[in-house]
Structures are given as C-alpha cells and as structure tokens.
Amino acid sequence: MAETNSRRRVAVLGGNRIPFARSDGAYANASNQDMFTAALDGLIDRFNLKGEKLDMVIGGAVLKHSRDFNLMRECALGTSLSPYTTAFDLQQACGTGLQSAIAAADGIAAGRYEVAAAGGVDTASDAPIALGNDLRQVLLGLRRAKSNVDRLKLVGKLPAAVGVEIPVNSEARTGMSMG
C-alpha cells in the first residue's frame, strides 16, 4: 500500500533582522528582549502585520538571564501583533535561529500553524552574570533561618562567599567553545 504524504508545503515569505554589531558597541545597553522585539517590529512593519495574530512566534537565545524565562512571549507582547499571538522559546548552541525556523516549518507542514515567525538573538553585552554558589547558599540560608542567631552566623559567612561567577561560552564537558 502506498504511503501518502499529508504534510503541507512550506514557504518562507520574508525576513527581517537588526544589523550585527560588536559586543559592547551599538547594542551595549540592549537586552535580548530589546533586540528580538526590534527585529520582530521590523518584520511587522515590512509585511503590514500590525494587529495580526500569528499562530506562533518561535525563537530564543543561548545567553539568557533568569528574567528571560518567557522571552519570545514577552517579545511578541512588546510588539503591535495581536496579544493572542502565541510564542515559545527554544535554545540550541550556535543554532537557535535555524532550529526555530525548522520548528516553525514543521508546525506549518503538519498543519498546526498557518503563519509563524522564527528567529534567534544573543548578546554578550548583557551577559547573565550569576552569583557564585557559596553566596547563593548563604542567601538561601538567610531566608530559611529560624532565628536571628542563625541569621547572624550566616551573615558572618558573607565576606568569604561574595564572588561573581562570569558565564563562559564553552561546553561544560569539554571546556571548548563553539564560537
């Protein structure tokens, strides 16, 4: 018995991007959200999509702050698209934008979406600098402490625990960078 292909054909109708810039240059004070929203705004203007509901906005970033937990949804809400436009994040080292486009195309081919936008964004200018694990443990301990004496004991550990953990662009198992 012959197998029929029920997947729909997919077409990329256009795109938009903001210019590349060196870290700590033109976008030194811009976040991932600022930059992706700007690119999405340009797409909306270019294709007259103001007020339109897209079936999905897919994208993401590799260097993300904890505040970026719902990055694509916040980006979509920051534009003039319909607030009913759905969005989700994904993340793949050196391939977030491409993986987003593949996910959008797959959703269209499978009939889950009619129209989708996809992309990726990253900035090293606004790198997510995290607290060191020792400081994090002291701060969490302060929150859980049952008495002032327990809190004072933990406060005494603060000077030794203060430290900044700067993220590195390397793979955890090999220590090598992909870019």
Task: List where the protein language model places each region.
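Residue-level detector of conserved, well-ordered beta-strand and adjacent loop positions
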Residues: 13-14, 91
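Short polar catalytic/cofactor-binding loops
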Residues: 15-20
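Glycine-rich phosphate-binding loops at beta-strand->alpha-helix junctions
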Residues: 61-67
